[in-house]
Amino acid sequence: MASQGTKRSYEQMETGGERQNATEIRASVGRMVGGIGRFYIQMCTELKLSDYEGRLIQNSITIERMVLSAFDERRNKYLEEHPSAGKDPKKTGGPIYRRRDGKWMRELTLYDKEEIRRIWRQANNGEDATAGLTHLMIWHSNLNDATYQRTRALVRTGMDPRMCSLMQGSTLPRRSGAAGAAVKGVGTMVMELIRMIKRGINDRNFWRGENGRRTRIAYERMCNILKGKFQTAAQRAIMDQVRESRNPGNAEIEDLIFLARSALILRGSVAHKSCLPACVYGLAVASGYDFEREGYSLVGIDPFRLLQNSQVFSLIRPNENPAHKSQLVWMACHSAAFEDLRVSSFIRGTRVVPRGQLSTRGVQIASNENMETMDSSTLELRSRYWAIRTRSGGNTNQQRASAGQISVQPTFSVQRNLPFERATIMAAFTGNTEGRTSDMRTEIIRMMESARPEDVSFQGRGVFELSDEKATNPIVPSFDMSNEGSYFFGDNAEEYDN
């Protein structure tokens, strides 16, 4: 990408740092996850969790949600100004699961937000450590991406359920900063913009006055984030039009939906990071590992290494398959919900199946579920190989526009062929090339038509043995040409409801 000089690496975004060299980045990312680990250990002490209970992913998620809620300034302010019955704005909590007499019990815990903030800052050398909070948000977002489908949200904004592979990060909170923006898919950004434009259409004052000025700045910033994800001049030119529109309305919505469709072939660049549950970092810190000294990267071998020797448990409902639960969490840990299943299976070393075939519901347990019948089992989060995470859309030829995989947003920088039926996608582009952006639309359609399915993405890139930490010997897998594996085929997952 041409603008590489101005871009910070996404480790730098993650740690809020200015330009740093590789060693400094590794150290500051290490400091960030080490802080999460120290916080987790302290919370386990506060809650008097046994070693086993501290390794339970459901407890980890509750503790993560508590600290995110404690630092959610906007919501805290809102809660204080709009007191609702039975909700103390100064407290946060959630379900903690304990093992009693061979059974799992649920216990609701409540803490002062102030107290949680104190523990978090103490674990992070007295700083607010926003980067660590964003890291936890991205882990929750990756878990949602693997667990739920967003068909309803897509349809509500006038998009097509087939665009689900563009929806990475769609549940990330607004406050997730630059690191959050980097991992959002094209569809997610389009959806946020469409929602904004629709509000402007329905509410005359949305763009007016002092508030409207702030809204406008946010709108243009989101347009620029989305523009930066596109890799072709024509797509970017349409984004300039959308951004500069005096009074954004239906024409802009049309343009955005057109761009989202085009991104099915001309993929945008979306970052991928392996963000692990807090308990995993806690286990490592407790065993004496010094993240800051050793350094850590979210996009290299480190997360794979960490998962090779961490034992994490999960509660299992009576008719769930523990192996499937493991697959769900493995995909979330590596941000691989939108990756080609052929690639994921090869790296993991066991077959990764589409979501429609999983006998497992989400990881979190609802408060009305019966604990009597709950069991727990070990999550198998190890892998056979490791691979470098990518931020490119996997288009075959970066110099000029070319094809990426249709129902896939690549996570791993690993060579794969592009088995796709271009005709099925091109059908979505019949007609409608009129209006201001007609020449750009025509250009985009032409590029998509000339995309060749026989090309390969990430040419020559391979996976590595777990002993090969310097990535010296790439093993380039060969895949069955015929079927691209999308995780979402035959989907029957629950919808994401906030």
From Swiss-Prot:
Subcellular location: Virion; Host nucleus
Post-translational modification: Late in virus-infected cells, may be cleaved from a 56-kDa protein to a 53-kDa protein by a cellular caspase. This cleavage might be a marker for the onset of apoptosis in infected cells or have a specific function in virus host interaction.
InterPro entries (UniProt xref): Flu_NP
Coiled coil (UniProt feature): none
Feature: compositional bias, Basic and acidic residues: 79-91
Annotated region (Disordered), positions in chain: 1-21, 79-98
Record-stated family: Belongs to the influenza viruses nucleoprotein family.
Function summary: Encapsidates the negative strand viral RNA, protecting it from nucleases. The encapsidated genomic RNA is termed the ribonucleoprotein (RNP) and serves as template for transcription and replication. The RNP needs to be localized in the host nucleus to start an infectious cycle, but is too large to diffuse through the nuclear pore complex. NP comprises at least 2 nuclear localization signals that are responsible for the active RNP import into the nucleus through cellular importin alpha/beta pathway.
Protein name: Nucleoprotein
